[in-house]
């Protein structure tokens, strides 16, 4: 009987961890979108303004797809949101790029979280997001 109870507790704990992981990933994606949009409105460079606008559009589309596929895997919804979404407002291009590099590292780290072969679809969408970020970083080299 003790084993059966331990299995139920273990399942609940695993389910709770999955919900927390889901919530953290979505929170980070919302933060990425907010940082890009806030910098888009803040920059005085037309080239940066246009590049961040295009990045935001692409990220918004791919992040939406990622989250919908992620939730669709177990037909779930996000029940519990992180209580705080950090609003980061980079003061300049250097700070903004540093934040973009942080998000790029976060995206690369998803490889360790999605190790099952059935998660290859999520990693493919993640790769599209990484591609958008890397192209954006290249385009930023033109904005002086």
Predicted regions and their residues:
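Amphipathic alpha-helical coiled-coil segments
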Residues: 65-70, 136-144
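Helix-loop segments that flank and shape redox-cofactor active sites
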Residues: 31-54, 113-118
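Acidic/histidine-rich alpha-helical segments that form the ligand environment
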Residues: 85-140
């Amino acid at each position: 009987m003790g084993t059966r109870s331990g299995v139920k507790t273990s399942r609940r704990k695993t389910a709770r961890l999955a919900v927390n992981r889901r919530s953290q990933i979505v929170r980070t994606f919302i933060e990425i979108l907010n940082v890009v949009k806030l910098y888009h409105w803040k920059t005085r460079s037309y080239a940066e303004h246009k590049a961040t606008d295009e990045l935001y559009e692409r990220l918004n589309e791919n992040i939406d797809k990622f989250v919908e596929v992620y939730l669709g895997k177990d037909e779930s919804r996000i029940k519990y949101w992180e209580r705080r979404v950090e609003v980061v407002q980079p003061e300049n291009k250097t700070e903004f790029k540093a934040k973009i590099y942080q998000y790029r590292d976060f995206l690369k780290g998803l490889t360790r979280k999605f190790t099952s072969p059935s998660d290859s679809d999520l990693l493919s969408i993640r790769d599209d997001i990484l591609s958008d970020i890397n192209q954006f970083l290249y385009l930023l080299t033109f904005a002086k």
